[in-house]
Amino acid sequence: MKTYIQLLLAALFIPVLSACEQEDDVIDIFTGKTWYMTYIAVEGQNKMYDFWQNDQDAREKSFKTITGDNYTLVFEGANVNDVAIGTFSGKATSASVNGDWSANGDNRELKITIKNGGGTDGDKYLGKAFMDGLKSAFKYGGDNKNLYI
């Protein structure tokens, strides 16, 4: 019986001893893939924000632009002193952008510095929101399958 209790206690403590760190693997999350925008939402919601103010024709026209290489981001980088840093490039529909980025896995702080591009996009709704979102990004969430900026 004593051996059984010892084995049970050992089995219960193994997960505690091998618990994962709470810090994100930022390089795994951001790099090695092309990120495609699926929607732009208000924080805490998972549906597309109504940039079109109920203008269904404008909405449909914008949604048709979410194809191919439109609304994409590619991050390259490395981990330096526990902070991921690198370069990025992105594209809305007609406007392209590139620059530097850094992210902290402890507090999920994100800094994006646009060096080139980031101007007016052909789609005045989603394209504008995509570019404005990059300019004002300060935090990220997600994992290596979903990225929220």
Protein language model regions, located:
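Lipid interaction determinants
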Residues: 20-149
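N-terminal hydrophobic targeting signals that begin at the initiator methionine
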Residues: 1-2, 21
